[in-house]
Amino acid sequence: MGNGINAGRKLLENRKKFRWSDRDYKRRVLQLKRKSDPLEGAPQAKGIAIEKVGIEAKQPNSAIRKCVKVQLIKNGRQITAFAVGDGAINYIDEHDEVTVEGIGGRMGRSKGDIPGVRYKVVAVNGISLKELVKGRKEKTVR
């Protein structure tokens, strides 16, 4: 590769060519996150709670993290979402409409000791799960 006075075009072409070996560049330009993401790039999504599941925490912790299997309304994909808060799982019943968002792990991945769970429940039937757990609001009977 030349560094001469007329080498500008070649340097630019090489930069463009070798940028494709950068994983982050490739994912960004081809929009691979949006294509593979169950939420399709949106910050939140609504879904129907299918079943409650207990997921065992990773070592060295020992607990059963209460999660919910959710089928998204927009595309029918199934995801597992964590029910945040003490006793929060009791406010979620099967066939409830839940709102989910990313759990906030590194690079859009899972967080802490919950393996394979990338989402958390934010609201149940349009009411904030945090408010339900604190007892400020009551769940509507539909």
From Swiss-Prot:
Gene3D superfamilies: Nucleic acid-binding proteins. One of its GO terms (cellular component) is small ribosomal subunit. One of its GO terms (molecular function) is structural constituent of ribosome. The keyword rRNA-binding applies. Transmembrane segments: none annotated. The keyword RNA-binding applies. Keywords: Ribonucleoprotein, Ribosomal protein, RNA-binding, rRNA-binding. Pfam families: Ribosom_S12_S23 (PF00164). CDD domains: Ribosomal_S23. One of its GO terms (biological process) is translation. InterPro entries: NA-bd_OB-fold, Ribosomal_uS12, Ribosomal_uS12_arc, Ribosomal_uS12_euk/arc. Part of the 30S ribosomal subunit. With S4 and S5 plays an important role in translational accuracy. Located at the interface of the 30S and 50S subunits. Belongs to the universal ribosomal protein uS12 family. This is Small ribosomal subunit protein uS12. The lineage of its organism: Archaea, Methanobacteriati, Thermoplasmatota, Thermoplasmata, Thermoplasmatales. The gene is rps12.
